[in-house]
């Protein structure tokens, strides 16, 4: 026969009250996503990044955006071009990751676009422990290799985030050898746009 043990009221209420919640800082586990599915809220609260749903509010900082793609990055890869620009300034998430791998390695992953070559140390920065091209280098690479619309948008984005014309031209000057493809077009775009003084 079960024995009744008297319990103080405050102990019972403390047991039933909600425990402190830990914020979601990354990809939610599948079991949590199945419970939380609500079509009208998903579009407002979650962003699809390379097939993983990420909480939208964690993507407001460069560190949060880097954390969102860190699991998909290969070891010692350096983020380049549109992916690096997205990490720095935000906007629509990338469909693929552009990276430079040491030793010219290639990847078979469908979402990974690899480039050969090394970036000069002055054209890289570290965000959240991962090496990434600077805003200036990312914009210059898009201006060299992207479509005309992407090229102009990248330079305008860099300008709007405080990168000067001189900085962009100096960064463009670092593009040597095979990395010099598209330099005349990028230089023309940089010199054609009005910059803040």
Task: Enumerate the language-model features and the residues they cover.
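Short gly/ser-rich loop at a beta-strand->alpha-helix junction or flexible surface loop bordering the NTP-binding
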Residues: 1-197
